[in-house]
Curated annotation (Swiss-Prot):
Superkingdom in the source lineage: Bacteria
InterPro entries cross-referenced by the UniProt entry: CusB_D23, Multidrug-R_MdtA, RND_pump_MFP
Signal sequence, renumbered to the chain: 1-21
Region (Disordered): 32-60, 392-415
Gene Ontology cellular component annotations, sorted alphabetically: efflux pump complex; plasma membrane
Biological source species: Escherichia coli O81 (strain ED1a)
Full protein name: Multidrug resistance protein MdtA
């Protein structure tokens, strides 16, 4: 009895648990069905709402500039090197010991300034010997001339023969020749002595010394004592394509000096301004270019020999040219074009013919007029007839942010 009673209770408990589980399963299924229609409706509404958002989105921002009419200079550009107007290697003309140097490396000197001295002792001795020989031969000549005068008187009375008179005359002439040779020897010795004092042959800047005091130097030394480069004035040699020769020649015939500007290696800073000096007499067949030389006063020493520069030569000025920023000019399948803004800020593509241009601006010969507004930034988002919003160019950081950044950098440097 007890066993059957327990079995019935177990069956009851199992049935209750099964009923509870079935209830929870049925309740969850109903919840999922009720949630599905709402989700489907939301999903169906999403594309429509997205399309409405696109239609009501902001206008494409662009930056614009106005085409202006102005005089535009035409430059020919080339790469060049600064060269000294004259370069002189100062060498000794005589052999001897270097006694003194009278210059500071890098200083400016004038022609005739004393640069160095060689021991003059041997040259003074040679000069004294030459002067002594000259004095001796002058005395001999004076005595020979007196004897000749006596011979001439005696010959009148036939006390001396004609042969003796002629011999005395020849002796005088010979001694006179010796005197001339002695005078040349004196001049040579004096010149050797003078050359022991070495002076600057040209105005210019001296370089680093090539020899120290106390060394024995000679006229055959190839390195010399110092090199002088004439930098006032100084020259710029650069190259132009052979196609520019006619333009340069035509500009020269106008009679005005052609202005040449020297810019630094990065072409961002103007160093000096000079004038065209000459064109080479032949074209380099290998490169198809011609060498051009310009001269600069260089009083501020902005240019140094062997310095690499960018040359710009003004050959003409185009008057009343229509100019726009270079950033506005675009290139497409049909050629060059710009995006032009109308009064409603709608853009349209205009084909143009560009002329003179540089990194900042370009001349437009045809296609637009002065006063037209052209797009300079935001071009990649444009389509024909699209309306845009013209905005001002803005810096990546505000002045306050820049000041904060600088202060932070200072603190970081001190830490």
């Amino acid at each position: 009895m007890k066993g059957s009673y327990k079995s019935r209770w177990v069956i009851v408990i199992v049935v209750v648990i099964a009923a509870i589980a079935a209830f929870w399963f049925w309740q969850g299924r109903n919840d999922s069905r009720s949630a599905a229609p709402g989700a489907t409706k939301q999903a169906q509404q999403s594309p429509a709402s997205g399309r409405r958002g696109m239609r009501s989105g902001p206008l494409a921002p662009v930056q614009a500039a106005t085409a202006v009419e102005q005089a535009v200079p035409r430059y020919l550009t080339g790469l060049g090197t600064i060269t000294a107007a004259n370069t002189v290697t100062v060498r000794s003309r005589v052999d001897g010991q270097l006694m003194a140097l009278h210059f500071q490396e890098g200083q400016q000197v004038k022609a005739g300034d004393l640069l160095a001295e060689i021991d003059p002792s041997q040259f003074k001795v040679a000069l004294a010997q030459a002067q002594g020989q000259l004095a001796k031969d002058k005395a001999t000549l004076a005595n020979a001339r007196r004897d000749l005068a006596r011979y001439q008187q005696l010959a009148k009375t036939n006390l001396v023969s004609r042969q003796e008179l002629d011999a005395q005359q020849a002796l005088v002439s010979e001694t006179e020749g010796t005197i001339k040779a002695d005078e040349a020897s004196v001049a040579s010795a004096q010149l050797q002595l003078d050359w022991s004092r070495i002076t600057a042959p040209v105005d210019g800047r001296v370089g680093l010394k090539q020899v120290d005091v106390g060394n024995q130097i000679s006229s055959g030394d190839t390195t010399g004592i110092v090199v002088i480069t004439q930098t006032h004035p100084i020259d710029l040699v650069f190259t132009l394509p052979e196609s520019d020769i006619a333009t340069v020649v035509q500009a020269q015939k106008a009679g005005k000096p052609l202005v040449v500007e020297a810019w630094d290696r990065t072409n961002s800073k103007k160093l000096s301004e000079g004038t065209l000096l000459s064109l080479d007499n032949q074209i380099d067949a290998t490169t198809g270019t011609i060498k051009v030389k310009a001269r600069f006063n260089n009083q501020d020493d902005a240019l140094f020999p062997n310095q690499f520069v960018n040359a710009r030569m003004l050959v003409d000025t185009e008057q009343n040219a229509v100019v726009i920023p270079t950033a506005a000019l675009q290139m497409g399948n049909e050629g060059h074009f710009v995006w032009v803004l109308n009064s409603e800020n709608k853009v349209s593509k205009h084909l143009v013919t560009p002329g003179i241009q540089d990194s900042q601006k370009v001349v437009i010969r045809a296609g637009i007029s002065a006063g037209d507004r052209v797009v300079t930034d935001g071009i990649d988002r444009l389509t024909e007839g699209a309306k845009v919003e013209v905005v001002e160019a803005q810096s990546a950081t505000t002045p306050e942010e820049k000041a904060t950044s600088r202060e932070y950098a200072k603190k970081g440097a001190r830490s």
